[in-house]
Amino acid sequence: MIKTLLFGSNGFLGSHLQSKLDGEVIGVNIRQQNWQENIPDDANVFINCIGKAHDHNGTATEHDFYFANYELVKVLFEEFLKSNAQIFIHISSIAAVEENERKEVLTENSVGNPQSHYGKSKKAAEEYLLKQSLPSGKK
């Protein structure tokens, strides 16, 4: 049976995705101290749904967006590399490519034009992941 670790399972996307996945799904709370020590050895998949998208109170800083959307991605990816899991899935955002209305269709080859700290931090995470080398047996 597939064992999936779902990061951000309490958020909007993660909470909706969790019930749709097959196999055993474990929500991982990275706000818990030493959360890395609780990663099961037999996990097959890491799914990252962690993200800071909104600033409802008007108090979020650039650092807040980059920490949640970029720095934590690097931490999760390093944990993935150390684990026995084979698959890392990162959920990004259209904002990493475009945040304004565009007449042409967006494709994988579209040049990114993020405007906000949210979009820029999501784009930075995508670029980081695309530059990483994967050992044999991981994707």
Where are these regions (language model features)?
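Adenosine-cofactor binding site in Rossmann-like domains, unifying the SAM/SAH pocket
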Residues: 22-39, 51
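Rossmann-fold NAD(P)-dependent oxidoreductase module
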Residues: 16-20, 79, 128
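Conserved Rossmann-fold NAD(P)-dependent oxidoreductase catalytic core, especially the SDR/UDP-sugar
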Residues: 75-117
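SDR active-site strand-loop-helix element
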Residues: 7, 46-50, 88-94
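Catalytic helix-loop patch of NAD(P)-dependent Rossmann-fold dehydrogenases
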Residues: 67, 102-139
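N-terminal Rossmann NAD(P)H-binding glycine-rich loop of SDR-like oxidoreductase domains
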Residues: 2-23
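NAD(P)H-binding glycine-rich loop region in Rossmannoid oxidoreductase-like domains
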Residues: 36-82, 96-100
